[in-house]
C-alpha cells in the first residue's frame, strides 16, 4: 500500500500512466514536453473535474523549478520521481507578509551545509508531499532548497481549503546538506510573480 508520505495521492499512478505527470518535462529529460498550451488544456480539464490531486503544484510548478535550476544526477532523480508519481514536490514560497515583501526565511552557511530558518504559509498539498522546495534568502541572494517533508526541524500545521484541498503552514529550523540548494542565481524564479509559472 502507499507510504504515509503519499497517502491521498490516489490518482497519482493513473495520471502517470496517462503521461500527465511528465507533461511539462522536456523530452530530453524523459518527459512529453507539451509546453504551455498542452499544460493549459490539461489544467482546464482537471479544474473542470475538480481534481484535488496536486497536478499544478507538483507536475507543473515543482517540475518547472527543478527543470530551471537542477543539472546532473540530481535532476534525473527528482524529475524521474515526479514524472512517475513516486513522489510529490511542492513550492513553499509565500510568507505571512505576502509576495510584495522581502523574504524573511533565511539560509545561512554552516561548515557542512546550510541552516534553514523561517515560516511559509498556505502551501498547497504540503501534507502529501515528499519534498518541499523552499525559497530562502542567502548571503548571495535568493536560494531554493529541497527539504524532506518528514525531516526533523520541519513542523507542519495542516488544514483544508474551502474546496477540500490539503494545505499547511510550515515552520523550518533545520540543517541541510550543501547540495540541498538547487542551482544558483535563483532570483529569476521570483520575477514570474504569484501566478507563476
Which ranges hold each PLM region?
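A structural signal for short hydrophobic beta-strand segments in well-ordered beta-sheet cores
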Residues: 107-109
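A short core secondary-structure module
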Residues: 92, 119-155
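A short, Trp-centered hydrophobic/proline-enriched beta-strand micro-motif
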Residues: 23, 84-96
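Internal helix-loop-helix
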Residues: 17-76, 80, 84, 125-128
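Short Gly/Pro-enriched turn/cap motifs at secondary-structure boundaries
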Residues: 95-98, 122-124, 159-163, 167
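Buried hydrophobic positions in well-ordered alpha/beta secondary-structure cores of metabolic enzymes
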Residues: 26, 42, 71, 116-118, ...
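Glycine-rich beta->alpha junctions and the first turn(s) of the following alpha-helix
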Residues: 48, 154-197
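Short secondary-structure junction/hinge motifs that connect adjacent elements
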Residues: 1-17
Amino acid at each position: 500500500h502507499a507510504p504515509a508520505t503519499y497517502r491521498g495521492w490516489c490518482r497519482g499512478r493513473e495520471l502517470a500512466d496517462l503521461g500527465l505527470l511528465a507533461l511539462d518535462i522536456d523530452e530530453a529529460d524523459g518527459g512529453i514536453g507539451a509546453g504551455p498550451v498542452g499544460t493549459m488544456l490539461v489544467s482546464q480539464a482537471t479544474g473542470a473535474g475538480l481534481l484535488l490531486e496536486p497536478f499544478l503544484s507538483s507536475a507543473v510548478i515543482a517540475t518547472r523549478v527543478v527543470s530551471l535550476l537542477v543539472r546532473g544526477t540530481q535532476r534525473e532523480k527528482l524529475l524521474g520521481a515526479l514524472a512517475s508519481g513516486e513522489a510529490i514536490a511542492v513550492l513553499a514560497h509565500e510568507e505571512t507578509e505576502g509576495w510584495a515583501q522581502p523574504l524573511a526565511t533565511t539560509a545561512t552557511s554552516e561548515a557542512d551545509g546550510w541552516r534553514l530558518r523561517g515560516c511559509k504559509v498556505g502551501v498547497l498539498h504540503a501534507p502529501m508531499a515528499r519534498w518541499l522546495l523552499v525559497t530562502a534568502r542567502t548571503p548571495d541572494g535568493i536560494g531554493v532548497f529541497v527539504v524532506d517533508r518528514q525531516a526533523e526541524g520541519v513542523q507542519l500545521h495542516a488544514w483544508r481549503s474551502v474546496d477540500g484541498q490539503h494545505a499547511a503552514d510550515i515552520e523550518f529550523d533545520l540543517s541541510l546538506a550543501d547540495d540541498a540548494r538547487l542551482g544558483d542565481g535563483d532570483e529569476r524564479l521570483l520575477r514570474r510573480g504569484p501566478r507563476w509559472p
